[in-house]
Swiss-Prot record:
Protein's GO biological process: gluconeogenesis; glyceraldehyde-3-phosphate biosynthetic process; glycerol catabolic process; glycolytic process
UniProt cross-references to PANTHER family, sorted A to Z: TRIOSEPHOSPHATE ISOMERASE (PTHR21139:SF42)
Oligomeric form and interacting partners: Homodimer.
Cell location: Cytoplasm
Primary location recorded for the protein, binned into one broad class: cytoplasm
The protein's name in its UniProt record: Triosephosphate isomerase
Keyword field contains Isomerase: yes
Protein family membership: Belongs to the triosephosphate isomerase family.
An annotated GO cellular component: cytosol
Top EC class of this enzyme: isomerase
Length: 255
């Protein structure tokens, strides 16, 4: 059975005490709910190794929120793919709107990161999505095409095999206002159809997560959509209880 992919993006949050209590709770209550899900946790870089130790005997994978395009050298403050792989990272988030806007990351930079992650046999979680203004001007599909095209051009039709795409409409991130699940379903179908125009990979092998103001009260309607294959969760992943509630709902749907 195909698994549901749930990624926790902690962003710039967490501390040693929080991490300890978070995993203490998960270890007590989560064991029977992880089988039907692939759960990934992406903490701040400084806590990657601590989280790695906590998940060593759990069915949870380690993710990174970012990676540099350089492997080594005089690049103060950066983290290379070799370092991430060395400590056990399996998934790397790239293209998040906060990186695009706050750190001025272009489609070209994101495509380079994508290539580096694939070359290192890790799995990229590629974020795409439109702003509220772009949505109002009916530019959602055009924006997503642009965000995918450079990767497709540089890496060819095999680029989208064994990856995760995360559709995160920027107007829904951290606002408390989630997108309509049926609208998200249509966008996911569009993304899959667009990829399949250029690639012969199996449709069922295209994994697309949704991200944007997800919580345990609204998640069921998203999980029920056939082309929503996972979730990229921000604020709701900081509470072990809330995060586990979401995992439980996904587990029950896929049981």
């Amino acid at each position: 059975m195909k698994k549901f992919f749930i990624t926790a993006n902690w962003k710039l949050n967490g501390n040693i005490k929080m991490i300890s209590s978070f995993f203490k709770y998960l270890k007590l209550y989560s064991s029977s709910y992880l089988e039907k899900n692939t759960v990934i946790i992406a903490p701040p870089t400084i806590y990657l190794e601590r989280v790695c130790k906590n998940i060593s005997n759990m069915n949870i994978f380690l993710g990174s929120q970012n990676v540099d395009i350089n492997l080594n050298g005089a690049f103060t403050g950066e983290t290379s793919i070799l370092m991430l792989r060395d400590i056990g990272v399996k998934y790397v988030i790239i293209g998040h709107s906060e990186r695009r806007f706050l750190h001025h990351e272009t489609d070209d930079i994101i495509a380079k990161k994508f290539h580096l992650i694939k070359k290192s046999n890790l799995t990229p979680i590629l974020c795409v999505g439109e702003t509220e203004i772009e949505k109002k001007h009916n530019q959602t599909e055009q924006v997503i095409q642009r965000q995918l095209n450079l990767i497709l051009k540089n890496l060819g039709t095999s680029a989208f095999k064994n990856i995760i795409i995360a559709y995160e409409p920027i107007w829904a991130i951290g606002t408390g206002v989630s997108a309509d699940p049926e609208h998200v379903q249509l966008i996911h179908v569009f993304i899959k159809n667009y990829i399949l125009k250029y690639s012969s990979i199996n449709r069922n092998d295209i994994i697309i997560q949704y991200g944007g103001s997800i919580n345990h009260t609204n998640v069921k309607k998203f999980i029920e959509q056939p082309d929503i294959n996972g979730l990229l969760i921000g604020n709701s992943s900081l509470s072990a209880k809330e995060f586990l509630e979401i995992i439980k709902i996904a587990h029950e749907h896929y049981s």
